[in-house]
């Protein structure tokens, strides 16, 4: 009995470790971009980009807290009503995310009055808005369902793969391009590919 209990605790610890690393790899995806931009363009351009990315991360982290609340509910009921719960949640989230562009225009209007010197940051924020939508769906729908179905290792593997791809793509961009917009488009492209892969 003790051996069985020890194995069970080890499996629980492994699952927790996979989830922890998967969550940190998401943060790393954003951190890699900040690091490369700071190294390539200096602190002034980095501050403009970082302001936009901080707003995106603020929204993603807020949505992530909602996903943490959803996980126990999904874990309890997924076996009996999994497909219906997924479809219903996906529909509701899609409706809510349609309001995100409206929120962007409100934020731009407020910040343009309050911080006019950060006008270029608001432009970057508009480019990164689809990234916020992709990541919000990831942390609100995909991550909780992968956790509920005990697919933490797949979640970690995909996140780490895209961390490596982002490092490679940013390294190539640093060599062959000095346009910061290409970095932003690279952010969007890889996030979109990850979103498609999970769905």
Feature annotation, model-predicted:
Residues 1-28, 69, 73-83:
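Interhelical loop/hinge segments that connect adjacent transmembrane helices in multipass membrane
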Residues 8-19, 81-98, 119-128, 146-158:
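Membrane-water interface at loop-to-transmembrane-helix junctions
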Residues 17-18, 33-37, 45-63, 130-131:
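Alpha-helical transmembrane segments of polytopic membrane transporters and translocases
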Residues 23, 50-53, 125-128, 132, ...:
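Residue-level recognition of transmembrane alpha-helices
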Residues 56-90, 142-148:
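Helix-loop junctions and terminal segments of transmembrane helices
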Residues 63, 86-137, 167-176:
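Alpha-helical transmembrane segments of multi-pass membrane transport and lipid-handling proteins
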């Amino acid at each position: 009995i003790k051996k069985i209990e020890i194995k069970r605790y080890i499996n629980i610890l492994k699952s927790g470790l996979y989830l922890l690393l998967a969550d940190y790899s998401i943060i790393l995806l954003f951190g890699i971009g900040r690091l490369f931009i700071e190294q390539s363009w200096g602190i002034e351009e980095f501050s403009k980009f970082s302001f936009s990315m901080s707003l995106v991360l603020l929204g993603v982290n807020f949505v992530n807290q909602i996903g943490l609340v959803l996980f126990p509910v999904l874990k309890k009921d997924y076996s009996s009503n999994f497909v219906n719960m997924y479809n219903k949640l996906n529909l509701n989230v899609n409706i809510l995310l349609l309001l995100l562009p409206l929120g962007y225009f409100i934020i731009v209007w407020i910040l343009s009055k309050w911080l006019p010197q950060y006008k270029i940051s608001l432009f970057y924020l508009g480019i990164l808005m689809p990234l916020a939508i992709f990541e919000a769906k990831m942390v609100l729908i995909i991550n909780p369902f992968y956790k509920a179905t005990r697919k933490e290792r797949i979640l970690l593997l995909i996140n780490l793969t895209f961390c490596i791809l982002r490092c490679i793509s940013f390294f190539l961009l640093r060599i062959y391009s000095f346009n910061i917009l290409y970095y932003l488009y690279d952010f969007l492209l890889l996030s979109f590919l990850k979103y498609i892969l999970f769905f």
